[in-house]
């Protein structure tokens, strides 16, 4: 019943393109956790291991009871690589495989289904600010339940270390754990507006950062060797467009793509701008503009197989939407 309510929530988004991209990261992490013995067969069979995406611009991801995980589009939109997203998902997965959720909930004396359900709905449907997020959680007891799901420092360190092993064994770049921490730390210093709720439930300490830095191979580059790919830049742009579907925001994407300075920026930045503009124009039913921008995106991504596939999927979406409008 609780899960059915989650799927009916207006903040829940079922987008095939984003879901495929996330699953392409998530499934190798699950396989790695199984291979390492972190994910016990009993837990594996009993839990859902499913990611639910929320149409929310805040930077957040969280583990929920029963093997469900929440992922805000805001997080997909700010990470610079699939490896950084993998580091967050591996961390959240490890909270569950190490039974942190069950240990925290066991401390709640009134762990009735409605209380847990209210906490889940409030977390997934968190809106544009902390006050609104708390308002979505039914009753003072449910707010207390959410507060108890703030992980201890010991749990955070354990999830970091287990998650690090899971993601590296799955083939993702280990440096992404550090670059993601750097991104969160810098954003926490610059923003105190509630846009990073992830940091409230996952306190980032200098000890955690130092621990992940110490785990890097000797002589490793301080930055990600893979960098931003065209494909990830396009998927991140999609997440940003879908998380802020207002008319003014959609029009801003078109203006960005028409900028004279766009040709002088790196290819991933160009791909993101063009992809976002095509999707925005499609949503605005400006199909002529969308088709023109799509031609530029097609040319830019022609030599990159994964990016070219994203372009073809976008072209099919444009054609389908235009056909439905006629």
Give the residues covered by each predicted segment:
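Membrane-active amphipathic alpha-helices enriched in small hydrophobic residues
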Residues: 113-128, 135-144
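Catalytic zinc-binding patch centered on the HExxH motif and its immediate surroundings
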Residues: 52-67
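Short alpha-helical catalytic segment bearing the HExxH-like zincin motif
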Residues: 70, 84-92, 96, 138
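Short pre-active-site segment immediately N-terminal to the catalytic Zn-binding motif
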Residues: 70-87, 149-154
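Extracytoplasmic and endomembrane cell-envelope/extracellular-matrix remodeling and assembly machinery
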Residues: 1, 12, 20, 38, ...
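Catalytic Zn2+-binding segment of zinc metalloproteases
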Residues: 80-83, 93-110
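Acidic/histidine metal-binding catalytic segments
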Residues: 105-117, 132-135, 171-181
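Acidic helix-start/capping segments at beta-turn-to-alpha-helix junctions
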Residues: 13-32, 40-54, 110-116, 180-187
